[in-house]
A protein has these predicted regions:
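Histone-fold recognition with a strong bias for associated Lys/Arg-rich disordered tails
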Residues: 1-120
């Protein structure tokens, strides 16, 4: 099922745009869950960082681990560089987030739905 970004809140759209920027900055063609989670954590006035801090999580450790995992992902040079597509894992997370949205009877997919889907 194609992802309907018109059903995303502004913050959720920004998270995907930021995730894409993270991937492109590292010459990575495949957009992964790690890119999205890092984007959610780094989001200005976002819920994810606040939630992790309230849970007592080591946020700097999580960010460091995400950066490390992202650095291990394949890089693309030359032809094809600059094009990004969603991995199967990330597509599954997006679909799970839409399921959460429907379960909660929300009209738009938010960062909360994405975070619930990632955590699941």
């Amino acid at each position: 099922m194609p992802i309907r970004f018109d059903r995303f809140t502004i913050k959720a759209q920004e998270a995907f745009q930021d995730a894409q920027t993270i991937a492109l900055d590292r010459n990575q063609q495949q957009l992964e869950v790690e890119h999205l989670l890092l984007a959610l954590i780094n989001q200005n006035e976002g819920l994810t960082l606040q939630l992790l801090q309230k849970l007592g999580a080591n946020t700097s450790g999580i960010i460091s681990r995400l950066e490390d995992e992202i650095s291990k992902l394949p890089r693309v040079e030359g032809a094809g560089a600059g094009q990004v597509y969603m991995s199967t894992r990330l597509n599954n997370v997006a679909e799970a987030a839409f399921s959460e949205m429907k379960k909660l009877r929300d009209e738009y997919l938010s960062t909360e739905h994405l975070l619930l889907a990632i955590a699941d």
